[in-house]
């Protein structure tokens, strides 16, 4: 695509995968321009949300500004949301316009699938900080009652159990309420 100019690398996302990609590219001597596309120049440290219900952490504690990281790594941040791809992935369509690339890394994370019956009545921590804050607020409002904690498995991969965060929430809430 860029026969006469320097190769352009585009990274989608601002989580662990995206930031590790940037760091490794630079550590291995890559000097090509890197554009990172994400709505905000911040990392949401999701492993720490287990501490929000107890009040040991707040959103402010878990949002890491990335401006200095981008400056150190010589990365251009495009504050935008991705809306699509074209030209076999060589053009990224965003809410701020199109971005051409010679190499594309999609590290935008996964999406939580809300397919379990009744899940619309549940607060699901996998959805991020706002969910953990809702759990915190509901716990503060309670004067008694029952708390149900559960998780579902992937029927296409029955040997894998991904309930770790739910156990962390469960044990943290148990400790908090004792």
Positions of the model-derived regions?
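FAD-binding core/adjacent interface of flavoenzyme oxidoreductases
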Residues: 1-7, 74-176
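Beta1-alpha1 glycine-rich phosphate/pyrophosphate-binding loop at the start
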Residues: 2-75, 156-178
